[in-house]
């Protein structure tokens, strides 16, 4: 399902279209995936997309990166999909949880693709009236502290990007939405840093089929690490002055036709509009 959203802000000087995707879970054993179908569905709109933002889990496991053929296929796959459009990525748990394979390995592979920028925890991309940052907590957050907002806060406060310009529309890409939403609800000054929009994924819509999402009102059935009834599993949520967009998955981790048919693929075309 392609969702279309609009957000207006006095900080936006010229309208922009962003393609937002998450949880692609590319792996070497699954050749046909939903990213191809997604691209076909939006082919008439794609030329109007200004930037592509990917909020993690680009691959299923870094273990596949020991295969040179998979690396070549991954590069070609991303180049074909993005068609040279500026693309910004923050890594997810599946991108960095590879036992002895360091997260820098994927980061270095992505650096070889000219139009793609994998954002580490120190960079701010300034593009006229917007800025884009990425935040990836370390793998211990996912393995030992998943959903622990205090651990997330410690790591986020070490997030060494330059101070956000309050006159720009500031976007943060991060994979897991749960902790940052809860922190923002408690005290907007802790986590806000003048952030206007947070793009995340990770939740796979809480395994709620698309037809039931309006009824469930952002809640999921099951979240990552078998968490039951997560509060924030999909959709757009505004807390204080920050909008949070929780994306569903492009590809399910369960590679079965019946699952794929039930849940489909998920992407959002977001228009940032200037206030007239």
Residue ranges of each PLM-predicted region?
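N-terminal active-site segment of His-dependent metallophosphoesterases
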Residues: 1-75
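Extended active-site neighborhood of metal-dependent phosphoesterases/phosphodiesterases
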Residues: 6, 73-159, 229, 236-240
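Beta-strand-turn-beta hairpins that frame and shape the catalytic cleft
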Residues: 8-19, 115-116, 123-134, 164-171, ...
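Catalytic metal-binding/acid-base residues of hydrolase active sites
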Residues: 25, 58-59, 93-95, 123-124, ...
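Charged helix-capping and loop-helix junction motifs
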Residues: 34-37, 66-77, 102-107, 185-191, ...
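Binuclear metal-dependent hydrolase catalytic cores centered on His/Asp/Glu-rich metal-binding motifs
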Residues: 39-40, 114, 127-174, 178-190, ...
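Conserved beta-sheet core of the metallophosphoesterase superfamily
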Residues: 178-267
